[in-house]
Amino acid sequence: MLATVQGVFAQWMTQRHAGAVAFEEPILCHHNYVARESYDDVELIVTRKGAIRAARGDLGLIPGSMGTGSYVVRGLGNEASLNSASHGAGRRMSRTRAKRTFSTEDLAAQTAGVECRKDAGVIDEIPAAYKDINEVIDAQRDLVDVVARLQTLLCVKG
């Protein structure tokens, strides 16, 4: 599936931005899983729910919202956090509250310049429903180094 997405994305970028896209090292990180890991010679079963592995050298992706960009990070190996970092910005408000608070017009305004759905079915994903990704990244300076900040151009939400 990754290869298919890469191919479609490269074609889309080439058509719209007149430049070839090359993919280097893939970032393979997931955020809801269980793993066996050793800390101080003790084997543990670590559950990461909404968190990514950030062992020394691990590449990770910490997404913001539909309209705020994301970060590529490299883990620092902070054992006090069980080599973990947040998976994303995190919610500022519940999905239900976001649906009650915002309109499709708000969604369109907050995602201007981003190719994405802008209908009532995704209002709960509006950028204002999420914490500020820059503040979240700043709070994790002891967990990850920033490799790159990504600007959102396209957001696929089922």
Where are these regions (language model features)?
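Domain-length cofactor-binding catalytic modules of enzymes
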Residues: 1-158
